[in-house]
Design a protein with these regions (language model features):
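Alpha-helical cap/lid subdomain in secreted, periplasmic
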Residues: 3-7, 24-171
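A short beta-strand-loop structural module common to alpha/beta enzyme folds
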Residues: 2-22
Length: 172
């Protein structure tokens, strides 16, 4: 991203939930300026652990708080939750996939209304073996490469097109 004059800082936390996101971003803002862009990739580990209504509520609160109160002028990008071949908190992968898709749709709808952006990950929808590690939950090295490449492509599109008013970036 250096060719666009931007640097990237990765802030991650094992087990992060949506309700942690606000405090993490408050801490980040206290240490430095408000960033130009934040990409949020969070929530898939808790599909099945929390009711989907609670998960969507936490997402909406986080999006609204970040965009309106904490990070004015910052572009918020939601990286949709990836499918998993196996889910930790469910005996029915099919039901959890339906929940994941429903929550992604809800997050996408909410964020686009708030003039945020969404990154989709269509390469993962077919759940090819090579994209996942042996545990069928985490990504393989190839899966991570594709994931990062999708994020980079979306960011490059945003940087090139960011001068367009009302742009709603949904990469495919």
């Amino acid at each position: 991203m250096k060719k666009f004059g931007y640097s990237i800082t990765w802030i991650g936390m094992d087990g992060m939930k949506w309700k942690h996101l606000i405090n993490i971003n408050l801490g980040m803002v206290n240490l430095s300026d408000i960033p130009y862009i934040i990409i949020i990739h969070c929530g898939a580990n808790y599909v099945g652990e929390e009711p989907s209504g609670n998960l969507m509520y936490d997402m909406k609160v986080a999006f609204s708080s970040l965009i309106i109160e904490i990070l004015p002028g910052c572009s918020i990008i939601f990286s949709e939750m990836l499918p998993k071949r196996t889910l930790r908190f469910s005996y029915s992968t099919h039901k959890m996939e339906k929940t994941r898709k429903r929550v992604n749709r809800g997050a996408r709808s909410c964020l686009l209304k708030l003039l945020g952006y969404v990154i989709k990950h269509p390469d993962f929808e077919d759940k090819y073996n090579g994209l996942f590690a042996k545990d069928d939950v985490h990504l393989s090295f190839i899966g991570y490469d594709i994931f990062i490449n999708t994020l980079q492509g979306a960011l490059e599109s945003l940087f090139v097109l960011s001068s367009l008013p009302g742009l709603q970036l949904i990469t495919q």
